């Protein structure tokens, strides 16, 4: 990993995505945002070090997207943290889809710790 680690936030809640982006940029990350619809376009042009994805993306299913990413040779090694306000999130994690999961609402410091753990960044 050269330079700033890149985080891709896949979230349809614009306010949450922007607040998370701002926090992570302060912590010296490069941050990309997708609402899910343009995810594959972004991945064609960028290789993030980690993906943070909401399980519920409007009409899209974050769990299915995660499964597709883990089956694709180009993206299967990218760690994915799933976010959800619902208990069913643990199912996505248990299916070996996600590498981590965080329940909403969450503290940004909790998210940072999970990112640092999964991409091996010292605090």
What do these predicted regions represent?
Residues 54:
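Active-site residues of response regulator receiver
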Residues 13-32:
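Two-component/phosphorelay signaling modules centered on CheY-like receiver
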Residues 58, 76, 104:
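The feature encodes the CheY-like receiver
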Residues 33, 57-60:
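Residue-level signal for the "D+5" position in two-component response regulator receiver
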Residues 106-117:
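C-terminal output helix
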Residues 81-83:
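Hydrophobic/aromatic residues positioned on beta-strands within the core alpha/beta folds
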Residues 33-50:
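Acidic, metal-coordinating helix/loop segments flanking the phosphotransfer/catalytic sites
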């Amino acid at each position: 990993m050269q330079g700033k680690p890149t985080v891709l936030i896949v979230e349809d809640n614009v306010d949450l995505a922007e607040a998370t982006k701002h926090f992570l940029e302060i912590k010296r990350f490069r941050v990309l945002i997708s609402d899910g619809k343009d995810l594959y376009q972004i991945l064609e042009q960028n290789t993030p070090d980690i993906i943070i994805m909401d399980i519920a993306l409007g009409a899209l299913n974050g769990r299915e997207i995660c499964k597709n990413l883990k089956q694709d040779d180009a993206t299967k090694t990218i760690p994915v943290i799933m976010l959800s306000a619902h208990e069913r999130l643990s199912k996505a994690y248990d299916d070996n889809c996600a590498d981590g999961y965080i329940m909403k609402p969450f503290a940004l410091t909790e998210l940072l710790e999970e990112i640092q753990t999964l991409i091996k960044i010292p605090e």
